[in-house]
């Protein structure tokens, strides 16, 4: 394994050629303040203790690493372990980062939070920690996503957040990020931008990765306890990339194959997909340089996925770098492949995963049979499927797999 891998951003915030701080001058003071505050918090044992306290007592960590016996047997290859991020409070990995950033905001004396959300999971996690720490929260959410995720919108409002519909563009996650950044610029004195994925201007990709790395750290100690060795392969789905970077990061220098699974939407031969790595090229969006779905003129294209959490047109800078150096292999799953995997997995394991996570499972179903029975795969179940029941039901009804 190549030990010459860059695992921290350089002083300008780059991983290789990706990352940086492509923001208006007006935001630079806030970015500098955040970077300094985070550096201090990271080195402060008291901050880390407080974070650990809430992760354990409030979120319910550590999450189990569950051996999927029936699923493993059905695929007839490698042993499959599930990292159960679906069992966190609020039902997904998003809370790991929301909690960490809320504690950081509190430490910085910021009383208000602004966030963006796609599937609504990050919005719910942000609203949850805002309620916990008595902070105000404004959430920007694309109007299209609001339609798809009504239950999560109500959850956020019940928790005390103000949800603002974004009509611009295609009314999805990318447009919500634009609005959240604009809002932050004009409220920077008393507001922290609680960014939900491993992207945005430096230091956000590092902050989000660090708070999500608890996933990979737990996997490492849990698999060593259960199997006495590291896994052969680790699989996670990728939108912006926070659950994946949190899963992969503690294994970057180990001899473990890492697979990120992007959303191929209606297929990689169509223009309705979210393949930032698969079909994208480097460009700048939302304050950072990363792989993007864009046309020849550099116009960012609309991303598509049946999963509201994966239809983002970019993929964080650290993933972009790991792709270029060949450390992480990027695969994909179409809407249909993901939904079929979701149905199959649920019937075998009695766990309904989020559609996002089902993209990772779809690749596991292709990978496991090619490996030996002694091999070990860990797949991150990034969230539970409650929020997706309507989409799943519709999909099954349309195909005659369920009654209307």
Curated annotation (Swiss-Prot):
Entry EC no(s): 4.2.1.20
Residues with PTM N6-(pyridoxal phosphate)lysine: 94
Pathway the protein acts in: Amino-acid biosynthesis; L-tryptophan biosynthesis; L-tryptophan from chorismate: step 5/5
GO terms for cellular component: cytoplasm
InterPro entries associated with the record: Trp_synth_b_CS, Trp_synth_beta, Trp_synth_beta/beta-like, TrpB-like_PALP, TrpB-like_PALP_sf
Biological role: The beta subunit is responsible for the synthesis of L-tryptophan from indole and L-serine.
Subunit annotation: Tetramer of two alpha and two beta chains.
Stated name of the protein: Tryptophan synthase beta chain
Organism: Staphylococcus aureus (strain NCTC 8325 / PS 47)
Taxonomic lineage: Bacteria, Bacillati, Bacillota, Bacilli, Bacillales
Gene name per UniProt: trpB
């Amino acid at each position: 394994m190549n030990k010459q891998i860059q695992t921290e951003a350089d002083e300008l915030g780059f991983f290789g050629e990706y990352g940086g701080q492509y923001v208006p001058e007006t935001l630079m003071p806030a970015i500098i303040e955040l970077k300094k505050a985070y550096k201090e918090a990271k080195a402060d044992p008291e901050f880390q203790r407080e974070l650990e306290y809430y992760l354990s007592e409030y979120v319910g960590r550590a999450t189990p690493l569950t051996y999927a016996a029936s699923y493993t047997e059905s695929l007839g290859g490698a042993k499959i372990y599930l990292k159960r991020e679906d069992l966190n409070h609020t039902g997904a990995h998003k809370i790991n980062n929301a909690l960490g950033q809320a504690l950081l905001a509190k430490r910085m004396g910021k009383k208000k939070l602004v966030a963006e959300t796609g599937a609504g999971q990050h919005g719910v996690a942000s609203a949850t920690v805002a309620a916990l720490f008595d902070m105000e929260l404004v959430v920007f959410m694309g109007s299209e996503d609001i339609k798809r995720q009504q239950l999560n919108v109500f959850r956020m409002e019940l928790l005390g957040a103000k949800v603002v519909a974004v009509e611009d563009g295609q009314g999805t996650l990318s447009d919500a990020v634009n609005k959240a950044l604009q809002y932050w610029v004009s409220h920077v004195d008393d507001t922290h931008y609680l960014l939900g994925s491993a992207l945005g201007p430096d230091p956000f990709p590092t902050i989000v990765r660090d708070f999500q790395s608890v996933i990979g750290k737990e996997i490492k100690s849990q698999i060593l306890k259960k199997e006495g060795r590291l896994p052969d392969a680790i699989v996670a789905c990728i939108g912006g990339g926070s659950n994946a970077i949190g899963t992969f990061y503690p294994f970057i220098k180990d001899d473990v194959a890492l697979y990120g699974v992007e959303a191929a939407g209606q297929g990689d031969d169509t223009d309705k997909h979210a393949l930032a790595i698969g079909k994208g090229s480097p460009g700048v969006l939302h304050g950072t340089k990363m792989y993007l779905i864009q046309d020849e003129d550099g116009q960012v294209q609309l991303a598509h996925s049946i999963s509201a959490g994966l239809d983002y047109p970019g993929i964080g800078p650290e993933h972009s770098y790991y792709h270029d150096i060949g450390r992480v292999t990027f695969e994909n799953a179409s809407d249909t492949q993901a939904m079929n995997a979701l149905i199959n997995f649920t019937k075998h394991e009695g766990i309904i995963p989020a559609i996002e996570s089902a993209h990772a499972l779809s690749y596991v179903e292709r990978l496991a049979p090619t490996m030996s029975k002694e091999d070990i795969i860990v797949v991150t179940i990034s969230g539970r499927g409650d929020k997706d029941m309507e989409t799943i039901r519709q999909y099954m009804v349309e195909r005659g797999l369920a009654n209307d």
